[in-house]
């Protein structure tokens, strides 16, 4: 066990310091915003320092472990630790939350509560990624939903209450299945509950029972990821939420579902995952084409970007179902890549709304001349979304593509068919991305504003946009920068997966 509680400090620091926001002067919006931004920067620096000096990339085992008895009656532990699978999402969480705080600078109504909720969400997300106890994972998963619901219901469009209610109904429904799975696995075959990830990874279950557990976890993670048909909350939520909240949803929240699918379904329930992986690949391929086909019909700019996110999540599902090193590495890279791309697209959509007060594409047009900086940034990021070579999306999708082709589990013809469907999805992506750019920036000026003059992106907005763009370019040019974090862990997961399958067959 680690002698110094680095991870505990990283998890509790945002919410503890964030609670002091309410002690600041009520009208001191600027002081409070700088205070929140400083907390996020300090947290990101602390996380980076801890991982740089106390984490070994070539070690696939859990590191920086902390294990404290919490509730004696239930034998419940505060158990934290990180490995190659969780380090990337934790760093992504810190980076996106810091920029989302800067993006939320224009928020003035109930600003104290808004920024506190962002910091509470920050703690919940890092806690979910670093939990090594199944019940602690569930508690962090649920805790994170509270600030998200409040952010959705209090700040946003006219239908924000409807979208927030829809979000909480979907996620709470999924959480019921998550809790059943957690209790079922923890209480199975033992007088005392066993909730330690390391212990559960070596636990064996009857196939029928393992399938039941798997389905419960799959439903919970399918809502968050989202996987069709559990996706309908996402376009409504993104369409109404404030764009800084959208950055957190697209950049981090969706990735929690993918993380849980690998961490729990694949690592703890390998035999059921082997049975369900062909279905995951089929659903992933359908999702890519379905969302890419639906996106062009969305006139709401943020809803169109939301459907593009659903399409990109299909590649993550296929990578997880490919049962290959290459495919799983591609899925993890897509988690990080889309975190940057999705957050950047929603940020730029929000900044354009701040200027023209329009969200529907059929009301826009001719914005390239008055807003050249916004036009340039959104064009580059749309290219990243459609997986232009040299940008991060291309490498991630290519790895998933090769992962399914080289997988040893599937026959040749099904692999060719899935690859063909993925290729169709890749062809459909430029249609909705480029048509979005055409409707926004080219053609006639459809917004009739007398003596119009719009301010282009300012220094703050350019800083946020460029900060999100640089990692996208960096990963596209040198993907090993991210892959080196997870490659050893992915190899260990795949090796343990196939060892468990072979061992089960021998029994």
Swiss-Prot record:
It is found in: Plastid, Chloroplast thylakoid membrane. Its main location: plastid. Keywords: Chloroplast, Membrane, NAD, NADP, Plastid, Plastoquinone, Quinone, Thylakoid, Translocase, Transmembrane, Transmembrane helix. It is an enzyme of class 7 (translocase). GO terms for molecular function: NADH dehydrogenase (ubiquinone) activity; ubiquinone binding. InterPro entries: NADH_Q_OxRdtase_chain4, NADH_Q_OxRdtase_chainM/4, NADH_UbQ_OxRdtase, ND/Mrp_TM. Pfam families: Proton_antipo_M. GO terms for cellular component: chloroplast thylakoid membrane. It comes from the Eukaryota. One of its GO terms (biological process) is ATP synthesis coupled electron transport. The chain crosses the membrane at residues 4-24, 37-57, 87-107, 111-131, 134-154, 167-187, 208-228, 242-262, 272-292, 305-325, 330-350, 386-406, 416-436, 462-482, 483-503. It catalyses: a plastoquinone + NADH + (n+1) H(+)(in) = a plastoquinol + NAD(+) + n H(+)(out); a plastoquinone + NADPH + (n+1) H(+)(in) = a plastoquinol + NADP(+) + n H(+)(out). The keyword Electron transport does not apply. Its EC number is 7.1.1.-. It is a multi-pass membrane protein. NCBIfam families: NDH_I_M. PANTHER family: NAD(P)H-QUINONE OXIDOREDUCTASE CHAIN 4, CHLOROPLASTIC (PTHR43507:SF21), NADH-UBIQUINONE OXIDOREDUCTASE CHAIN 4 (PTHR43507). Belongs to the complex I subunit 4 family. This is NAD(P)H-quinone oxidoreductase chain 4, chloroplastic. It comes from Oenothera elata subsp. hookeri (Hooker's evening primrose). The gene is ndhD.
């Amino acid at each position: 066990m680690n002698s110094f509680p680095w991870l505990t400090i990283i998890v509790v620091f945002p919410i503890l310091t964030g609670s002091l926001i309410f002690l600041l002067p009520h009208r001191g919006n600027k002081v409070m915003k700088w205070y929140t931004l400083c907390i996020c920067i300090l947290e990101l620096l602390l996380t980076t320092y801890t991982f740089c000096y106390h984490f070994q990339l070539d070690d696939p085992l859990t590191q920086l472990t902390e294990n404290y008895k919490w509730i004696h009656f239930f034998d419940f532990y505060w158990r934290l630790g990180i490995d190659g699978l969780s380090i990337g999402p934790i760093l992504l969480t810190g980076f996106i939350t810091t920029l989302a705080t800067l993006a939320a600078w224009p928020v003035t109504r109930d600003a104290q509560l808004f920024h506190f909720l962002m910091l509470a969400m920050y703690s919940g997300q890092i806690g979910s990624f670093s939990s090594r106890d199944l019940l602690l994972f569930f508690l962090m998963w649920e805790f994170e939903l509270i600030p998200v619901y409040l952010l959705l219901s209090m700040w946003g469009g006219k239908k924000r209450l409807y979208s927030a209610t829809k979000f909480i109904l979907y996620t709470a429904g999924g959480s019921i299945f998550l809790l059943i799975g957690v209790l079922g696995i923890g209480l199975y075959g033992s007088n005392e509950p066993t909730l330690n990830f390391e212990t559960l990874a070596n636990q064996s279950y009857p196939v029928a029972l393992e399938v039941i557990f798997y389905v419960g976890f799959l439903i919970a993670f399918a809502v968050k990821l989202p996987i069709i048909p559990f996706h309908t909350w996402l376009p409504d939520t993104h369409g109404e939420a404030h764009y800084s909240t959208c950055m957190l949803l697209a950049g981090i929240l969706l990735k929690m579902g993918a993380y849980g699918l690998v961490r729990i379904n694949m690592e703890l329930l390998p035999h059921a995952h082997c049975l369900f992986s062909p279905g995951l690949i089929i659903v992933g391929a359908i999702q890519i084409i379905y969302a890419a086909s639906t996106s062009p019909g969305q006139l709401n700019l943020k809803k169109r970007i939301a459907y593009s996110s659903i399409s990109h999540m299909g590649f993550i599902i296929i990578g997880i179902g490919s049962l290959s090193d290459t495919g799983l590495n591609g899925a993890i890279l897509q988690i990080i890549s889309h975190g940057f791309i999705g957050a950047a697209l929603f940020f730029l959509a929000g900044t354009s709304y701040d200027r023209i007060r329009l969200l529907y594409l059929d009301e826009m047009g001719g914005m390239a001349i008055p807003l050249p900086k916004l036009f340039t940034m959104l064009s580059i990021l749309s290219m990243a979304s459609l997986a232009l070579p040299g940008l991060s999306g291309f490498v991630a999708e290519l790895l998933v593509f090769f992962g399914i082709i080289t997988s040893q589990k599937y026959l040749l013809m099904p692999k060719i068919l899935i690859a063909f469907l993925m290729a169709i999805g890749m062809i459909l992506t430029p249609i909705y991305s480029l048509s979005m750019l055409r409707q926004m920036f080219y053609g006639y000026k459809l917004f009739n504003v007398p003596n119009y003059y719009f301010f282009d992106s300012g220094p703050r907005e350019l800083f946020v946009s460029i900060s999100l763009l640089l990692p996208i370019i960096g990963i596209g040019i040198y993907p090993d920068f991210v892959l080196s974090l997870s490659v050893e862990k992915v190899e260990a997961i795949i090796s343990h997966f196939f060892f468990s399958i072979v061992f089960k067959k021998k029994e």
